[in-house]
Amino acid sequence: MSRSRIVVADDNHDAADSLAQLLDLMGYDAVAVYDGEQAVRACHDLHPDLAILDVQMPLLDGCAAARQIRDEEDGRAPLLASLTALKLQDEPLSSGRDLFDTHLSKPLRIDELSSLLARTTAVPR
């Protein structure tokens, strides 16, 4: 049986790689990418159960990537979680907050991540 797939997108390579490694250790099949365009491609190619998108990324920010993922996947988009140090009322998140199913704050706390994973269909197998 295959493991649930998660895409982690953050322009901070260390942060993306660390989170993907943690998710792998937790039993998920996690892939790290480093900008919004890569996130859109990964979601299109890999059909993940969950995508965790940093809001402020180069080339295509997290909100624009979420919009494109939703448009391209036509109802089959993964659960989308924003990951940001911004407050919800801050730009650019406020204009795109409805694009995400949930929001995570930086620095990411393990209990928040565990809660998100428990609420998703992304279950380790």
Model-derived features: where do they sit?
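Non-catalytic signal-transmission and effector/linker regions of two-component phosphorelay proteins
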Residues: M1-V7, A20, R109-R125
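Conserved sequence signature across two-component system core domains
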Residues: A9-D10, V33, A51
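Active-site beta3 strand of CheY-like receiver
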Residues: L46-I52
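Active-site residues of response regulator receiver
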Residues: D54, T84
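Alpha4 helix (beta4-alpha4-beta5 surface) of REC/receiver domains from two-component response regulators
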Residues: A64, L86-K106, D111, S115
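Two-component/phosphorelay signaling modules centered on CheY-like receiver
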Residues: H13-V31
